[in-house]
Amino acid sequence: MAPLLRVYGALLLVQLLFGLHYLTTQLVVERINPVEWAAMRISIAGVILLLLHRHSIMRWPVGAEWRQVALLAALGVVVNAVFFAMGMERTTPAHGALIMCMVPVLTLAFAVALGYERASRAQQAALVLALAGALVLLEADRFRLTGAYLIGDFLVFISATSFALFLVLSRQAVDRHGAMGLTALVMGASAVAMAPLSLWSGIAHADTWSSLPQYVLLAAAYTIIFATVVTYSLNYYALGRVPSSQVALFIYLQPLIATSTSIAVGRDVLTLRLLVSAALTLGGIALTALSYRSESKGNGNPP
């Protein structure tokens, strides 16, 4: 197989694996407290990723750099995973996938707000479109805050926002430690932080964990191994071989995979509101990606 086909195959596999994890996460948090589940997922996946990719760390942190690693771990892993799990307990896989797909647009918003970038007109339009998509999904047009999935959607939005802020604040750390190296560091630090809660949950609720149905255990194992360890590793494999703009475009597949799977098992219903929200949100992401691609061509850099 040609090298480029292997890369694109890896990216397709990443989106398939990650697209399914909205459903598997929901299956788990229906039986396990979402915060305890997030702690268990982080602890196990963090140790595995650190062991697998410790040699990718270009330079280990020293002194105050550990504080930055701790902050990035809190934003990019702990807050992200905890609020995602809490949100998926209260919303649907289709809603969750659509909101998490706003990460590229939220990243742009933070980069502009913090002075790292200046938004072009196309990027400003992208922010407006994505915001409109979120408001439609949250039923803001009805001027009420009582939607069936409002709380869950908002919790997932906090997760997406936290991860977007992590992406913006991690740029210097990526240069210091390497992309996969930083991931190993923040996952390892997060595993240490969440280990006490994981141990307490495993001991205090041993009966609950041991009596989980087989399908829940399989969903939990899938989420930890395939939707965390494998996807992180494949994503960085691809980032080392094709431009990041091409990697980002594959995120479009997540809502399609998550929604179709969720509808197939009866956990979602395809509505006009969901379609309109998807069109607006994905339109915003498309404008963001195209604007970065245009800037790269104009600067003579690879897209």
Region locations from a protein language model:
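Glycine-/small-residue-enriched transmembrane alpha-helix faces in small-molecule transporters
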Residues: M1-A39, M86, L145-Q172, M180, ...
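Juxtamembrane helix-entry segments on the extracytoplasmic side of multipass membrane proteins
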Residues: P3-V7, R31-V35, A39, P61-R67, ...
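Transmembrane alpha-helices of multi-pass small-molecule transport proteins
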Residues: R6, E30-V79, P104-A111, L129, ...
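Specific transmembrane alpha-helical segments of multi-pass solute transporters/efflux pumps
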Residues: L17, H21-Y22, L50-M100, V136, ...
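Membrane-interface helix-cap regions at the ends of transmembrane helices
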Residues: L20, T24-L27, R31, A45-V62, ...
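Specific alpha-helical transmembrane segments that line the substrate/conduction pathway
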Residues: E36-V47, G76, F84-L127, S159, ...
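Helix-helix packing/entry segments at the starts of transmembrane helices
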Residues: A38-M40, A81, G96-M102, L169-V192, ...
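Hydrophobic transmembrane alpha-helices of multi-pass small-molecule transport proteins
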Residues: L49, A70, F110, A119-D141, ...
